[in-house]
């Protein structure tokens, strides 16, 4: 019975991978990483603050990473996610994907709400959403923060994308 169950589960996952898509309830793991059916998925075309990165609001340090993760939790709680893979998994097994929830782009919503920034080196799809969030001073844009890519460079942190 266990073998049958495992075989069925592997067949379902293989079908999803072959179709370049993964579906199911999502859980926020980090500010731009979700987990679906045990598979970690990095959101394509966007970037966000990192651990040890300070943000300020009204001259005081605030927990911007926790706020970004919480916003992603709110978004993924709205329904199951469908993610279209954008290449092979990285060295940690994470997929890079465009995801939707209720037919809305999760990637774009996180940027539009100001808790992620566009990553134009991957796609320009989210540049307008970032500009709108910045202009409206929502999310991270309410205060000051270093762009995540610049923070990683300054801190000597290398994050490989698939």
Each model region followed by its residue ranges:
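Sec-dependent signal peptide recognition
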Residues: 1-8
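Small beta-barrel nucleic-acid-binding modules, primarily SNase/OB-fold domains
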Residues: 5, 16-162
């Amino acid at each position: 019975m266990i073998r049958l169950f495992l075989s069925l589960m592997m067949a379902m996952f293989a079908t999803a991978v072959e179709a370049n898509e993964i579906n199911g309830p999502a859980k926020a793991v980090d500010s731009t990483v979700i987990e679906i059916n045990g598979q970690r998925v990095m959101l394509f075309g966007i970037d966000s603050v990192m651990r040890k990165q300070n943000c300020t609001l009204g001259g005081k340090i605030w927990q911007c990473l926790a706020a970004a993760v919480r916003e992603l939790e709110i978004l993924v709680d709205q329904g199951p996610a469908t993610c279209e893979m954008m290449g092979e998994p990285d060295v940690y097994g994470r997929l890079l994907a465009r995801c939707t929830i209720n037919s809305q782009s999760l990637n774009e919503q996180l940027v539009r709400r100001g808790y992620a920034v566009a990553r134009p080196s991957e796609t320009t799809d989210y540049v307008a959403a970032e500009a709108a969030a910045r202009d409206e001073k929502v999310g991270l844009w309410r205060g000051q923060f270093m762009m995540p890519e610049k923070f990683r460079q300054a801190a000597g942190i290398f994050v490989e994308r698939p």
